[in-house]
Amino acid sequence: MYIGLDLGTSSIKIVLVDRNDKVLEFSSRSIPTERPSIGHSEQDPNRWFEALLDGFDELSLKAEKDMKRVEGIGLSGHMHSAILMDSTDEPIGNAILHNDGRAGKEAHELNEKFPDLAEKAGVIAMPGFTGPKLLWLSRNEPEKFKQAKYILFAKDFLRLKLTGTVATDVTDAAGSWLFDQKKRKWSEEFISVCNSDDLVLPSIFESPNP
């Protein structure tokens, strides 16, 4: 038995399948979005995990025996989020989502000052990417930013809560504007221009890796 998780911006969906990919049960929980200011779009990461556990409870009621035989969990989720994490593995405030536009000025500045970085990143800087948002946080919420020890992306927050592992895959890394596409690793240059030298970035694995 396997579980597939998809953390979307409007809901988290959980599916229980057998070894033949037959869907046995399905659960979905809505996720609220907060918009504290014009152009801002945020969610509470702890609400994601609460919704996940609630969905697990539903599946356990529907298929208790099958849930006890689960061998693995696959994770997917929305990209480009910025979640600041403290030294106790708890989020510092809300996650800033991909459709948040507060870092428009920072994205424009990065493209103007460092045009050569677009080739390394594989794309120009955009407001929804993690790197520009980290630059915005360093300038506009410096106290919160200084508390942060590392960052995570959406699905990787759930991985941390489920396994205690701080990690990501190349897909989320590539969408962060902190990643060198050719070298397939975090770029010190990107990290520096986004004022994020003191942050620890998660270990990167290929997407199919357990």
Label for each model-derived stretch:
Residues 100:
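Carbohydrate-associated surface elements
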Residues 9, 117-210:
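Gly/Ser/Thr-rich active-site cleft segment
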Residues 61-65, 112, 139, 143:
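Secondary-structure boundary motif
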Residues 104-116:
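Hinge/lid segment of periplasmic solute-binding proteins
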Residues 20, 87-88, 113, 140-142, ...:
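Short loop segments at secondary-structure junctions
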